[in-house]
């Protein structure tokens, strides 16, 4: 399937000079959404994934569907202050500033095979932080799946050593 044709580009959103990739057009197409999940699942199914995780918020869309398809658990990676129990957190750099991600400290177990999923790979900061957070709890990230990769931003380089697939490159 031509996934790229299912994604709308909105120029100058959310600010001038940004070319936003709107995934809602793919998500509302049941066949395209199904095909995206099946394509990702086919790549990682042989690895025996135990757990799928993704960062808030759009990462949840693909990560939870993929976890269901792989018969694996799903762990949400949250923004600070959203989880009710003891957490492990990690800070990471943004272009202008810093952000944090959190997860319950009992979310992952040593030896679990984890797949990290997000909608978009740009600079790789969020996904790198997610990998580091998961692995700080003893689990092993065995792959990364994204719908869209903005290739010119070089995010894949920050994920070296991991099996990374993207269904669409811009």
Swiss-Prot record:
Pfam family, one: Pribosyltran
GO aspect biological process, one term: purine ribonucleoside salvage
Keyword Transferase found: yes
Keyword Transferase: yes
Record-linked InterPro entries: Ade_phspho_trans (IPR005764), PRibTrfase_dom (IPR000836), PRTase-like (IPR029057), UPRTase/APRTase (IPR050054)
Catalytic activity: AMP + diphosphate = 5-phospho-alpha-D-ribose 1-diphosphate + adenine
Keywords in alphabetical order: Cytoplasm, Glycosyltransferase, Purine salvage, Transferase
Pathway: Purine metabolism; AMP biosynthesis via salvage pathway; AMP from adenine: step 1/1
Primary residence: cytoplasm
EC number(s) per entry: 2.4.2.7
Gene Ontology CC: cytoplasm
Entry GO MF terms: adenine binding; adenine phosphoribosyltransferase activity; AMP binding
Intracellular or extracellular location(s): Cytoplasm
Domain of life: Bacteria
Role summary: Catalyzes a salvage reaction resulting in the formation of AMP, that is energically less costly than de novo synthesis.
Subunit structure: Homodimer.
Family (UniProt): Belongs to the purine/pyrimidine phosphoribosyltransferase family.
NCBIfam families membership: apt, PRK02304.1-2, PRK02304.1-3, PRK02304.1-5
Name the record gives this protein: Adenine phosphoribosyltransferase
């Amino acid at each position: 399937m031509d996934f790229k044709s299912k994604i709308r580009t909105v120029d100058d959103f959310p600010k001038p000079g940004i070319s936003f990739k709107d995934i809602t057009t793919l998500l509302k197409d049941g066949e395209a959404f199904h095909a995206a999940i099946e394509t990702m699942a086919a790549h990682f199914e042989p690895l025996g994934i135990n757990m799928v995780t993704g960062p808030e918020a759009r990462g949840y869309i693909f990560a939870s569907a993929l976890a269901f398809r792989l018969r694996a658990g799903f762990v949400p990676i949250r923004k600070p202050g959203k989880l009710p129990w003891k957490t492990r957190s990690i800070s990471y750099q943004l272009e202008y500033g810093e952000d944090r991600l959190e997860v319950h400290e009992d979310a992952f177990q040593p030896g679990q095979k984890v797949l990290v999923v997000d909608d978009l790979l740009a600079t790789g900061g969020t996904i790198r932080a997610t990998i580091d957070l998961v692995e700080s709890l003893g689990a092993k990230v065995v792959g990364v799946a994204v719908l869209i990769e903005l290739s010119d931003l070089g995010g894949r380089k920050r994920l070296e050593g991991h099996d990374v697939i993207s269904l669409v490159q811009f």
